Amino acid sequence: MATAPSYPAGLPGSPGPGSPPPPGGLELQSPPPLLPQIPAPGSGVSFHIQIGLTREFVLLPAASELAHVKQLACSIVDQKFPECGFYGLYDKILLFKHDPTSANLLQLVRSSGDIQEGDLVEVVLSASATFEDFQIRPHALTVHSYRAPAFCDHCGEMLFGLVRQGLKCDGCGLNYHKRCAFSIPNNCSGARKRRLSSTSLASGHSVRLGTSESLPCTAEELSRSTTELLPRRPPSSSSSSSASSYTGRPIELDKMLLSKVKVPHTFLIHSYTRPTVCQACKKLLKGLFRQGLQCKDCKFNCHKRCATRVPNDCLGEALINGDVPMEEATDFSEADKSALMDESEDSGVIPGSHSENALHASEEEEGEGGKAQSSLGYIPLMRVVQSVRHTTRKSSTTLREGWVVHYSNKDTLRKRHYWRLDCKCITLFQNNTTNRYYKEIPLSEILTVESAQNFSLVPPGTNPHCFEIVTANATYFVGEMPGGTPGGPSGQGAEAARGWETAIRQALMPVILQDAPSAPGHAPHRQASLSISVSNSQIQENVDIATVYQIFPDEVLGSGQFGVVYGGKHRKTGRDVAVKVIDKLRFPTKQESQLRNEVAILQSLRHPGIVNLECMFETPEKVFVVMEKLHGDMLEMILSSEKGRLPERLTKFLITQILVALRHLHFKNIVHCDLKPENVLLASADPFPQVKLCDFGFARIIGEKSFRRSVVGTPAYLAPEVLLNQGYNRSLDMWSVGVIMYVSLSGTFPFNEDEDINDQIQNAAFMYPASPWSHISAGAIDLINNLLQVKMRKRYSVDKSLSHPWLQEYQTWLDLRELEGKMGERYITHESDDARWEQFAAEHPLPGSGLPTDRDLGGACPPQDHDMQGLAERISVL
């Protein structure tokens, strides 16, 4: 009896030990001879591909290479055995030709020329395929609209929305949030495709021949029939999907994670604010609060009863970072992009949480040990809850559009254009379908909108206009009163003109005033009639804020509990401003006193290092505080830096400016009381910018030897005496400077809130771990130690800090002198230091000796050129 052939391992249909005999009692023997089919001349070679117990008849085009045969084999695996496919299958298979005349039944196919007409080619899995290869199977994700409630199979939360709520895998049928696609492991089971695929053959005798219902196909036809091949094909594959398709995290990341040690989950009782299912049993977590358990590291959710059945496969917090870009298999529409971004932004992550703001500040060269050590007891630098994140909406909303006739005092020819009014300007288009426009009238340049008054420029033989738009450079006469005949062309008529006049007036008003309700039983008063209670500018009393400033409601610079900060413009000068709009109806008396305290303090201050207050407007419902608009804050600079921390040179530059501004405040007996990186604003996008202090809501008037006891400020930056409700003085600000300096150089907060601050300060190993403090100078650590003194009498003052050797450096002096040259004012350095630094430059061969002018900052930075270059690019993006 003939010897049974050895079946390839790892593919379906291969008989194993104890397998039942084939039906009918037939023994497995060598495949019987196949009846060759005669192809058309020049059409190619027809042969059979066998995978396990399945055979498919294929036609290989003439002059094809071995790569085509491998593609055909991969296509059959994807069609018949989707659960057995994996990433890189193309490179992990071998082709053997059955040769009954040879002692070795299977002959390795080395080229397409080895395959002859009617041959049987066996597909065998190579020994180079590892266990990890079988575990990595990318998902084929497409945007899907669900008709019934569905839950994400990654995070367990419900997929919200009416349409296009999430992503569905075409292979396994699992559902995911769009935001979760960044973290989905490549573990597609292919169960959905397996249900749709054909069954394998029962024995080797039932061979699919070239019938109409079978698969006699060419390489092109077989490739077209498989739509899921894209993530598994070599670069030569041309198959694509018509639908938007996405994949999860990169394959290389999965390979790295498979080699990591998996640890048990750390479950904590959690209260869920949205419907969530248990990721172990796939059942809903029921209840109003404390519904289940959540792993504090990987955010795995489960029932309390299911926690014991959850495997020890926690991969830690590093996976939930959202830093892996989602690859796109095909192009997708702008609507899909916006929907994806909206879903990502509305991810339910609490602002300031570790999952959103965790910084990876450790250098790669310090190794895994340094990273683990630096992350044990430290809180990463983050934006605290009281802070405001600067954001700008993508586009303005169209308030009104339509055809309008108009002329001006500079051109009396009456024209007709398609006007479009948004929150920032009036655009005059040639027609309603083109993007080409005739003119733009920014709302910030409109001084007044008046009823028709000047009829001296009305073109002869035409009707008078309806209203006038007055700017500093021109006056526009808009609309046309109807003549003797009713109706008329579009853009004419008193009714249309009144609609445009009302819309423009409303656009010129602050957005908050347009919907302010009037008190019951009272006639609605004119909300635009405002009075200025405090002013530092040449503006008369009892004027309308809309006549002085244009507030852009779509440019939100920040928001808080009681109001919103909008961008704006001064109408006459075009100067950018920031307008803090506060709702007095939601404003407690205590916070209102803080606001008035801030305004009163800022009114008395005039210093280049302190934000400038222009004026304050007030109505019965609202308060408008107008200040100069700056570029960003110091926290954004730290978070956007390459290593999550600032170089020493830049930190010296910024800390010196902060100390100079504090010296001016303390000279006037003003203590800021809420100093933190969020309240240190950048005046420009320069790599070495001017900084200004802002947010004086907690500021206090404290004499040189006076003390206060009221609770103020942000706890993360507050001195111990405030947290312990003890008396404090102006040295409170110096503690905050020490914390700012610490977080700037390290990217982490110096203290753990669960332990005593005094004990932490005395533990040098805890305060200054090797990563990253081994790369920071001893002078910086010494200054921080003198600022973070629990005893107030030992804490450095402003003048003592400015005289510290770490800040008294020639390079820092050069940087500050260049800034003063740009500002045209000397307020940081002093003339008495010039001779000392000139002598120092003569004795030490340092670049840039003498008074600096315009020079390249990067060229004068010996140790940290690469840091400053990367930081300059990020600051320009802010």
From Swiss-Prot:
Alphabetized InterPro entries for the sequence: C1-like_sf, DAG/PE-bd, Kinase-like_dom_sf, PE/DAG-bd, PH-like_dom_sf, PH_domain, Prot_kinase_dom, Protein_kinase_ATP_BS
Impact reported for residue 710 to A: Abolishes phosphorylation. Loss of Tyr-717 phosphorylation and any other tyrosine phosphorylation, and increases NF-kappa-B activation in response to oxidative stress
Effect ascribed to mutating residue 275 to G: Increase in ability to bind phorbol ester, slight increase in ability to bind DAG
Family in the record: Belongs to the protein kinase superfamily. CAMK Ser/Thr protein kinase family. PKD subfamily.
Species lineage: Eukaryota, Metazoa, Chordata, Craniata, Vertebrata
Activity control mechanisms: Activated by DAG and phorbol esters. Phorbol-ester/DAG-type domains bind DAG, mediating translocation to membranes. Autophosphorylation of Ser-710 and phosphorylation of Ser-706 by PKC relieves auto-inhibition by the PH domain. Catalytic activity is further increased by phosphorylation at Tyr-717 in response to oxidative stress.
Species of origin: Homo sapiens
Molecular-function annotations in GO: ATP binding; diacylglycerol-dependent serine/threonine kinase activity; protein kinase activity; protein kinase C binding; protein serine kinase activity; protein serine/threonine kinase activity; zinc ion binding
Domain PH: 397-509
Biological role: Serine/threonine-protein kinase that converts transient diacylglycerol (DAG) signals into prolonged physiological effects downstream of PKC, and is involved in the regulation of cell proliferation via MAPK1/3 (ERK1/2) signaling, oxidative stress-induced NF-kappa-B activation, inhibition of HDAC7 transcriptional repression, signaling downstream of T-cell antigen receptor (TCR) and cytokine production, and plays a role in Golgi membrane trafficking, angiogenesis, secretory granule release and cell adhesion.
UniProt motif Important for ABL1-mediated Tyr-717 phosphorylation: location: 724-726
Modification after translation, per record: Phosphorylation of Ser-876 correlates with the activation status of the kinase. Ser-706 or/and Ser-710 are probably phosphorylated by PKC. Phosphorylation at Ser-244 by CSNK1D and CSNK1E promotes nuclear localization and substrate targeting. Phosphorylation at Ser-244, Ser-706 and Ser-710 is required for nuclear localization. Phosphorylated at Tyr-438 by ABL1 in response to oxidative stress. Phosphorylated at Tyr-717 by ABL1 specifically in response to oxidative stress; requires prior phosphorylation at Ser-706 or/and Ser-710.
Predominant location category: cytoplasm
Protein name: Serine/threonine-protein kinase D2
Pfam family, one: PH
Effect caused by changing residue 438 to F: Loss of phosphorylation. No effect on phosphorylation of Tyr-717 and on Ser-706 or/and Ser-710 phosphorylation
Effect of residue 710 to E: Constitutive kinase activity.. Increases Tyr-717 phosphorylation
Catalysed conversion reaction: L-seryl-[protein] + ATP = O-phospho-L-seryl-[protein] + ADP + H(+); L-threonyl-[protein] + ATP = O-phospho-L-threonyl-[protein] + ADP + H(+)
The entry's keywords: Adaptive immunity, Angiogenesis, ATP-binding, Cell adhesion, Cell membrane, Cytoplasm, Golgi apparatus, Immunity, Kinase, Magnesium, Membrane, Metal-binding, Nucleotide-binding, Nucleus, Phosphoprotein, Repeat, Serine/threonine-protein kinase, Transferase, Zinc, Zinc-finger
Assembly behavior: Interacts (via C-terminus) with LCK. Interacts (via N-terminal AP-rich region) with CIB1 isoform 2. Interacts (via N-terminus and zing-finger domain 1 and 2) with PRKCD in response to oxidative stress; the interaction is independent of PRKD2 tyrosine phosphorylation.
UniProt-annotated stretches for the region Disordered: 1-35, 224-247, 343-373, 844-869
Effect of residue 438 to D: Slight increase in Tyr-717 phosphorylation. No effect on Ser-706 or/and Ser-710 phosphorylation. Increase in Tyr-717 phosphorylation
Zinc fingers typed Phorbol-ester/DAG-type, residue spans: 138-188, 264-314
Modified residues (Phosphoserine): 30, 197-198, 200, 203, 206, 212, 214, 244, 518, 706, 710, 876
Phosphotyrosine: residues carrying this PTM: 87, 407, 438, 717
